Design a protein with these regions (language model features):
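Short, solvent-exposed loop/turn segments at secondary-structure junctions
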Residues: 26-29, 48-50, 107-110, 159-162, ...
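SAM-dependent nucleic-acid methyltransferase catalytic core
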Residues: 1-10, 14, 58-175, 179-185, ...
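Short glycine-enriched, charge-decorated loop/helix-capping segments at active-site entrances
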Residues: 187-191
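A short helix-to-beta-strand connector/capping loop
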Residues: 38-40, 147-152, 227
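Conserved S-adenosyl-L-methionine
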Residues: 4-5, 15-77
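Long, positively charged, glycine-interspersed low-complexity recognition regions
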Residues: 193-262
Length: 262
């Protein structure tokens, strides 16, 4: 997504772009844009306490996070311990909770936090729980985040609050990627009910100045909620719920629609 967003931001000709993710999760695109100086700063928001704790730990306790990645055992006993920390959702220790999020994201099947461990509890599968836990690579990613931390803001607000807060800012490019309609309860700790999707659409439809993109799984409900805005299919090469190719729905603000068509 980062390359696609870079092209759009270039077409929009925004001065000192501010990239905002109200439902951040991994926020990989935002970090890539920041590292390449495509955007001046980024705001990462997620109401999920584990996601918030990860980004807080990664930006404010980078060295400690890197040390944990270097030292942590890769075993089923440790996986169980980290799962219990994650389930506790105790934000009084953002380092512990944030690291548990990171550990499970790297050791669970397809990175799904509530999913099972890669290779199964018996570790009898083709791939084991260490398959996606390359210590050197992960330490490098954390180091990059730490080096950019003075240009990263982290918050744990309701996503609609963030959309409303930045909706009148013409320098903002907002990537709104809320919980899915169909598989939301399987993929997110804070999944959405129908009314939540409706409330978000009401908020997005009131945005006046910010440039924005919304992405969802294909859903008649979402198509109807955003029927006054440009919509198209977006093909992704990987999706957490189904490795391989996946098609999502992309919805865009008027200015972004023009940029997509340019």
């Amino acid at each position: 997504m980062a390359g696609f967003f870079e092209d759009l931001i270039g077409c929009l000709d925004i001065v000192n772009p501010h990239y905002v993710e109200p439902y951040a999760g991994g926020a990989g695109a935002g970090i890539a844009l920041l590292a390449e100086d495509v955007v001046e700063r980024i705001t990462i928001n997620d109401i999920d306490p584990a996601v918030y704790s990860f980004w807080t730990a990664a930006t404010k306790h980078t060295d400690e996070m890197m040390r944990l990645v270097y030292d942590v055992p890769l075993s089923i006993d440790e996986w169980r311990r980290q799962r219990e920390i994650y389930k506790s959702a105790d934000v009084s220790d953002v380092l512990a909770l944030g690291f548990s999020f990171f550990y499970l994201n790297r050791t669970n099947r397809s990175g799904i936090l509530n999913g099972g461990v890669i290779g199964g509890l018996a570790q009898a599968g083709k791939y084991k729980l260490n398959a996606r836990f390359n210590r050197e690579t992960l330490i490098g990613r954390l180091e990059r985040i730490g080096n950019l931390s003075d240009r990263i803001s982290v918050s744990s607000l309701d996503g609609r609050t963030v959309v409303g807060r930045y909706g009148d800012c013409s320098d903002v490019f907002m990537y709104i990627d809320p919980p899915y309609v169909v598989a939301g309860s399987k993929l997110y700790l804070n999944s959405f009910e129908v009314r939540d999707h409706e409330k978000l659409a009401e908020t997005v439809n009131q945005v006046k100045c910010a440039n924005w993109i919304v992405t969802y799984d294909q859903s008649e409900l979402i198509s109807e909620l955003y029927d006054k805005h440009f919509q198209c299919e977006l093909e992704l090469t990987y999706s957490a719920q189904k490795p391989g190719k996946a098609v999502e729905l992309l919805i865009a603000s008027p200015a972004v629609r023009v940029a997509i068509s340019a």
